[in-house]
Amino acid sequence: MKTLFEEIKASIKNNYNQDRSFWRPVLPWGGVFTIKAGRKAVSCTPLYVEIRLKNTCTIDGFLMLLYVILNENESFPRELSLHFGREFVDCFLYLMDTYSFTTVKLLWIWDKMEKQQYKSEVHKASLVIDLFGNEHDNFTKNLENLMSTIQGSYCSNWHCPTRVQEDQQRTISINPPQEIPHGNLIRLAVDELFCSKIELCEERGCGGLREFSQRVFCHGAPPFVVLNMQHWKPEDLAYVPYYLDLSDHKYLLEGATLFNKEEHHYSAAFQIDGHWMHYDGLRNVNLILLNKPPEFLLLSSLVYIRATEK
């Protein structure tokens, strides 16, 4: 039996223009998990015999991207095991390979999310878990310390009340430049966050110059990074760079997550073997080859994978 990833690659290779869609639904929105309980389950309180998932698009697109990333490089599963745990990575890949889509969502919810990040209630004989919200809250912030970065700075004024500072961040949120210059805006914004620089110290009454060191990853360059782009306007995103330099490492564009404002719904785009695909778990035909970028969708995040060192 072929794995899901092998099936997707085969469908790309054997694709004809008449049919650009994958032959079966992948990670469909929501999900129902039936509990195979014995007789003793009757005495449980509260009693429910199935788990129903709602509004799972806040994790679906990233789960699809994570699956593709883990299959892109043979060293990535081992590296990510250091952050997520070997058991989680092995179980995640097995469940995706075998089309166990509801179970893989439950794996993420119970292993990586905090209880306060989602709503749950017992309705009749079902436990209903609702993931309505923001995908960066439900996924990106739960990536352990994978993308943690740190940047130090010191002020030239010896009397500065906080002369030496350290700024540590667990996620990478890229803000658009306040003044829109010419050139690659995303790369400029990334450089603003990561590169060394000298600025006027913002401490009240200081007046000194603050020198910032290069921002570096706390645990080495991760296999992939997620750039939070939800504060950007479409007109600022005319060009998306296919590679970025982050802390002396080159990263290549692998995919993106997209937001439909009217439906308050997330989807994802990613590439396999140079072909771009669009995944939308809410549609009946939810995995298709792209001729052009999806229209009327806002960019929520960009996902880059670390380039292989030659």
From Swiss-Prot:
GO terms for biological process: cAMP-mediated signaling; G protein-coupled dopamine receptor signaling pathway; gene expression; memory; neurogenesis; NMDA selective glutamate receptor signaling pathway. InterPro entries: C14orf28-like. Disruption phenotype: Conditional knockout in dopamine D1 receptor (D1R)-positive neurons improves working memory, long-term memory, adult neurogenesis in the dentate gyrus (DR) and increases dopamine D1 receptor expression on the plasma membrane. The synaptic plasticity of glutamate neurons in the DG is increased. It comes from the Eukaryota. Could be a regulator of the dopamine receptor signaling pathway. Interacts with DRD1, the dopamine D1 receptor. This is Dopamine receptor-interacting-protein 1. It comes from Mus musculus (Mouse). The gene is Dorip1.
